[in-house]
Amino acid sequence: MTSVLDVTNRDRLIESESLAARTLQERLRLVEEVLVDVLAAESGQELVDLLRRLGALSSPEGHVLHAPEGELLKVIESLELNEAIRAARAFNLYFQIINIVEQHYEQQYNRERAAQEGLRRRSVMSEPISGVSGEGFPLPHTAANATDVRSGPSERLEHSLYEAIPATQQYGSFAWLFPRLQMLNVPPRHIQKLLDQLDIKLVFTAHPTEIVRQTIRDKQRRVARLLEQLDVLEGASPHLTDWNAQTLRAQLMEEIRLWWRTDELHQFKPEVLDEVEYTLHYFKEVIFAVIPKLYRRLEQSLHETFPALQPPRHRFCRFGSWVGGDRDGNPYVKPEVTWQTACYQRNLVLEEYIKSVERLINLLSLSLHWCDVLPDLLDSLEQDQRQLPSIYEQYAVRYRQEPYRLKLAYVLKRLQNTRDRNRALQTYCIRRNEAEELNNGQFYRHGEEFLAELLLIQRNLKETGLACRELDDLICQVEVFGFNLAALDIRQESTCHAEALNEITAYLGILPCPYTELSEAERTRWLLSELSTRRPLIPGELPFSDRTNEIIETFRMVRQLQQEFGTDLCNTYIISMSHEVSDLLEVLLFAKEAGLFDPATGASTLQAIPLFETVEDLKHAPAVLTQLFSLPFCRSYLGSNSTPFLQEVMLGYSDSNKDSGFLSSNWEIYKAQQQLQKIAESFGFQLRIFHGRGGSVGRGGGPAYAAILAQPAQTIKGRIKITEQGEVLASKYSLPELALFNLETVATAVIQASLLRSSIDEIEPWHEIMEELATRSRQCYRHLIYEQPEFIEFFNEVTPIQEISQLQISSRPTRRGGKKTLESLRAIPWVFSWTQTRFLLPAWYGVGTALKEFLEEKPAEHLSLLRYFYYKWPFFRMVISKVEMTLAKVDLEIARYYVQELSQPQNREAFCRLYDQIAQEYRLTTELVLTITGHERLLDGDPALQRSVQLRNRTIVPLGFLQVSLLKRLRQHNSQTTSGAILRSRYGRGELLRGALLTINGIAAGMRNTG
């Protein structure tokens, strides 16, 4: 095993001698040694020896050492199924443990960084690379027109920017940001204005669902806690450390042995409410406690540099969720499921508040003998006595000299009553008026009532010269989470609404032809007419199909949610695959029928949010927004929002990438943001872009800091909304320090991108060049994916897409509508499949051809220009950096093995030609990325990431060969079963499928993403 893991090679991940680096090295050594001991004890030394032999397939750099032929491949092919499964499980377990150690290291590193920020502040660049938005100091450029642009910059400027930009990307903290703003002479009034409107919303989704079982997640958390305890021991007295360390090592070994004996695969397909509980875990265990720390860190950093400025409101960072509300392609998200989700969320947050108030009762033991209270607190106690006499009888004597404890006893009882009432509402069939009602004052109808009581206590403490951090933290949490924890977005695909209206209008006989046959202009006219009348269109009793009835009932359920939980819980309806303005008007018509849209005024408590996903829809998005803003009721409609005159627009990274490739997708999204912002400003409206980013690069994933800074100037303005995919929640929010770091990084990037900008965004000729590159890249990508008749068969045979669809990891089907076409396949399994085979094709294919064709026009000048882009333009640098990172994870040798071994004999020649085409594009892309970046090897600019990728690649190589072997056996078994041939395998299909799925789990853990 040690030859696979190479535990003696201590410089593989990081060369720094920091405490965090030493901790990483020590922890890697420890867990690898423990894992070897566990495997030997549980499965014998033979398994350890087998893993060492398999490790010889990969080089130290993490790629296949040589063509996979000869004795080693014979070993894999000759493995008994049980041996192959044990090997796959061992690699899977190794990756998951390494992930824990890396997260632990990241947390340790973040602590070190926070402690050293005072030194780091003096390390900021002396030369600014960007300026104040709209006011001053944009980075000067030498290009004034297209001719100048193509002439290229000087080598000196290239070098200086190459040195400077990585320094800026190293940081992402408040303590670094505010001194930098001061150094750049950003006017404090601009900073204050931005802080006043700072609005960051992170939306958790269930898809792609985390591939790891919740049971395994629990074990991972226990391992992480043991590593934390080891850290504490290292700071203890030496005579205590050895004995305790041995005890912890024994506990670690015991935990991993239990883990080894636990099934890794999901035993059943999760239901939607299972996904809800999984997501809520991160709020309960981490996020709830981290939010006050985030606010305190911002406030402290701000006041150290700008003591006169006021920090933003507590609600500057909020959360949303699609889990339980996203219906797009998921038939299991019913109205009652969404209702139960809202109750689950409220129950969680109320339980946390109850715990906090109980702690405050113990803490605030102030006596009237030693402190004064204000009359308003005494008045409130008299009112409490009338409303909750039982509490007065119980505590009046005990707390007669302790007014804060008495007040909090009343608060606690109201919270408990509110929680009990919420539990009674959890069954959807029980409406609010049917639930047990309490008298006013005995429970809280909304979070603002609870907050008012906390503020009363805080004000009394401050007036008497006291403060209570735990109370301040609770107030912060209430302002951020309220009683609903996170806002619930509803999402549905656009054709569902059109088909429902088609059935409704046909039943009523009010249109001359089916609704779906109307032109866009005819649809718009009819929808506007219906929106202007109070006459209901839909009868109270629903005589329609189940699908249409469910659409109608969803809107009625939203109305009930708003009545019970408040409009803040659920006020956005996202329309996926939006094409025209009629897609939005259809949703507003259903909202009107449910009482959410007022036809007399145009006011609405539900906003229709278009989601533009394909390249064609992104190009058409400005026209759709123009039509929406031109509607006669639009000003009243937007003016009724919680943020007046703000329209939200969602841009999809996944389907646009699947549709046109990585470069074209990113450029179309970039352009769409610029155009939509200009349109909103021309109508006098505000715009919030909702970024539908996935976890993988092929779906818009990657470092959030660089991605936010790469957005066009003037499109953020302190306001952003981003999805946090189910698969990345563990890597970002499983540990408090990681969660705090992630939230601080996002907030820092939003402030920085709003106040500082690169003037390159305004150079039109540079956009023309990007348009050329995007067009060429798209043509190359689509030629392979959509214009090669054998490609869909190639994809189905050489990737594990068939087997991925059988993983029990998601409540949602892998395809829209169940059709087996490339267009119906969701972007998540599309990316997942290419990741498993090490092609990672969606994140880079077509980029090399686009760069090559551009460089061929004027080689020297255009190369200089592309390097200039890379050094100066955050957008272009982000694109190239993501491509570089993805290329480093590609392994064409293992990919070739998938093609050779999994292709049907009649397809092998054609599929090998496709492989050669992909391999040629890979080599071309790698060569040109290295030329532009100036690196000798991929990721030379980030040695720590380079070593991490190499470490993972090395162990993924043998796991990939195991996967191919198991897939081949499984498919041969399926083929023999289908043809009626005599089965030659000694194993059943279930055992073979289990082995294949275990390798999928392992590679996903190694690559750290599914889709």
UniProtKB/Swiss-Prot annotation:
The keyword Ribonucleoprotein does not apply. Its EC number is 4.1.1.31. It is an enzyme of class 4 (lyase). Its cofactor is Mg(2+). One of its GO terms (molecular function) is phosphoenolpyruvate carboxylase activity. Gene3D superfamilies: Phosphoenolpyruvate/pyruvate domain (1.20.1440.90). SUPFAM superfamilies: Phosphoenolpyruvate/pyruvate domain. The active site is at H207, K658. It catalyses: oxaloacetate + phosphate = phosphoenolpyruvate + hydrogencarbonate. Keywords: Carbon dioxide fixation, Lyase, Magnesium. InterPro entries: PEP_COase (IPR021135), PEP_COase_bac/pln-type (IPR022805), PEP_COase_Lys_AS (IPR018129), PEPCASE_His_AS (IPR033129), Pyrv/PenolPyrv_kinase-like_dom (IPR015813). It comes from the Bacteria. GO terms for cellular component: cytosol. GO terms for biological process: carbon fixation; oxaloacetate metabolic process; tricarboxylic acid cycle. Pfam families: PEPcase (PF00311). Forms oxaloacetate, a four-carbon dicarboxylic acid source for the tricarboxylic acid cycle. PANTHER family: PHOSPHOENOLPYRUVATE CARBOXYLASE. Belongs to the PEPCase type 1 family. This is Phosphoenolpyruvate carboxylase. It comes from Thermosynechococcus vestitus (strain NIES-2133 / IAM M-273 / BP-1).
